[in-house]
């Protein structure tokens, strides 16, 4: 197995449907709204900075075109490792307004894709 790390901005096409959990956080509102899921804002535990996050499951169909906008990885803070994606087209239709969202690196590693020429 070879390590493949797409460059930021490279266009990728999903070769299989990809299902993943999305954290209800303001940076993910576009994909949450696109899928018709009600956004549930983050709650804080009273008197602390501890957060209670809500997640919802989302699926992008095979053929969806997306790119990577950001990698976030910090040593010693693995629970925050994430990749931000931008969806450019679904079902062969270019989106007028791109969907931008982030998922954990573990969720991103489950995506099957190929590079778009």
What feature does the model see in each segment?
Residues 73-88:
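Short aromatic-glycine-enriched beta-strand elements
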Residues 12-14, 66-68, 83-87:
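Hydrophobic beta-strand residues in large extracellular and virion-surface proteins
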Residues 49-72:
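Conserved beta-strand/loop element in small beta-rich adapter and peptidoglycan-binding domains
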């Amino acid at each position: 197995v070879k390590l493949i790390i797409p460059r930021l901005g490279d266009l990728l096409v999903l070769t299989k449907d990809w299902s993943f959990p999305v954290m209800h956080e303001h940076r993910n509102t576009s994909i949450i709204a696109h899928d018709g899921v009600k956004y549930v804002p983050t709650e804080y535990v009273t008197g602390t900075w501890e957060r209670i996050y809500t997640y919802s499951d989302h699926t992008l169909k095979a053929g969806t075109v997306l790119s990577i906008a950001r990698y976030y990885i910090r040593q010693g803070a693995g629970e925050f490792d994430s990749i931000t994606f931008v969806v450019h087209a679904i079902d062969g239709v270019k989106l007028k307004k791109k969907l931008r969202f982030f998922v954990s690196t573990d969720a991103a590693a489950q995506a099957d894709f190929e590079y778009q020429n």
